[in-house]
Amino acid sequence: MSVLTAVVLGLVQGIAEFLPISSSGHLAIAEHLLSIQGASNVPDFFDVLLHLGTLVAVFAAYWDDIRDMIVEFFTGIGDLAHHRTPNPVPPARRLILLIIVGTLPLFVMVPFRRFFTKLGDNMYFIGGALIVTGILLFVSDRVRHGRKTEKTATLLDALLVGIGQAIALCPGISRSGMTITAGCFTGFERKFAVRFAFLLSIPAVLGANILTLKDAIDTGIDFSSVPVYLVGVVVAAVSGYASIRLLRYVADKGRFGAFAYYCWAAGVLTLVLTILH
């Protein structure tokens, strides 16, 4: 793999992972355009590293929340050991519970992960999925904004958002787009919908990386390419952080319409180019 390819894929991963335009779909398109599909597909180990790069971006952007949850996790263990029940439950502890429940639907989908991976080779599916993502974003802009935060959101709310995240395993369906849209439909405050979507991505990305790392070990890791891979990781982390900041700004304005139009254009273009090819 060349440095240029690593930079391009890192940039695509960092931007598309957090903006609601589907990183899996755009990576598949980029791989197709760069002619590195099929037998010479992007190495699993590089895929793992790219996702770790975007995970660094989430930690950098939401470190205060993550730190509070880590502290509250150990405080909660102490409360259990001493049979204490805080009333009310601290917001950070509620957030931990919401994230755990929101992650559960992914476990149901684990047996089908190879099926979803194969869908990434189908440009017709990806083009259609991008159009669907655009529709979801367009509709989410027209949903009445709720007021729920971690203090008032229910476990059922978190489960519904988690189902949206599980559906986004389909390449071309944006994970952030699905989770933010699901959050808006369940009555989340727009800023909290975005924050919860990113925090919910942490166990999802870690879990996916564990499974992909196993595949990488089975197929063999080319350690001589690691320096090139690390270039892509840095690009993914930096562009990912910038994307998070941009999406938070857009959330403050309450408009995702531009992303919807982009997804429609990208989806139609993908379908047209695939047909012509």
Positions of predicted regions on the chain:
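Multi-pass membrane proteins that catalyze or facilitate reactions on polyprenyl-/lipid-phosphate substrates
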Residues: M1-H277
